[in-house]
């Protein structure tokens, strides 16, 4: 957070149906600058390069600072982000992109080898604080703490490449078995940093 006024709003549009808006506000809450805040946010959506793939992100980051004197500083920090659609996580094979297919053609640049119902979403939360107090020119105490939680949900089927040798039975079987991932994952972390 800053004690000087900050007021910023942004709008952005671009190719692939990109639409984005964001804001960043910060200021002191009192005349002495003892209390200050900052609020930053973002909303974004776009189509990914591959067909049927989208990106969506919503984030907000509130922060609050308490400075009772010039030797003490306590800042509360937080960040919340939701990505209902994170875009395309597949890959395109060498056959059909770098090298032509046996029929001489190449895959389109928006080719999606996955299933139409592929999804990958992510939700992140972080809260913490930063504290320091200067006793004198020699001794200062600092502590930073952060708790983070990350949840992901995935449902996807994807290919391993193009079967370039149809006479090979193993290749036929290998190309027919597309791997699938489905799951929900949760990670929680605590980070503490002390300095004296």
Predicted segments, located by residue:
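Outer-membrane beta-barrel translocator/receptor signature
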Residues: 1-62, 66-72, 125
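Acidic/polar loop-and-plug regions of large Gram-negative outer-membrane beta-barrel proteins
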Residues: 44-48, 61-67, 71-134, 138-140, ...
């Amino acid at each position: 957070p800053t004690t000087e006024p900050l007021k910023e709003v942004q709008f952005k549009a671009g190719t692939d149906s990109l639409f984005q808006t964001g804001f960043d506000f910060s200021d002191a809450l009192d005349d002495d600058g003892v209390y200050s805040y900052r609020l930053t946010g973002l909303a974004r959506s776009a189509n990914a390069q591959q067909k049927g793939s989208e990106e969506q992100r919503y984030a907000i980051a509130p922060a609050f600072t308490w400075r009772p004197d010039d030797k003490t500083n306590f800042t509360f920090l937080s960040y919340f982000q939701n990505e209902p659609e994170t875009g395309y996580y597949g890959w395109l094979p060498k056959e059909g992109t770098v090298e032509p297919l046996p029929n001489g053609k190449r895959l389109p640049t928006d080719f999606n080898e996955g299933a139409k119902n592929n999804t990958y979403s992510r939700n992140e939360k972080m809260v913490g604080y930063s504290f320091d107090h200067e006793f004198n020119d020699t001794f200062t105490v600092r502590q930073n703490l952060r708790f983070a939680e990350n949840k992901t949900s995935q449902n996807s089927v994807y290919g391993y490449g193009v079967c370039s040798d149809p006479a090979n039975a193993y290749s036929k079987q290998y190309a027919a078995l597309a791997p699938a991932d489905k799951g929900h994952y949760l990670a929680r972390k605590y980070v503490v940093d002390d300095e004296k």
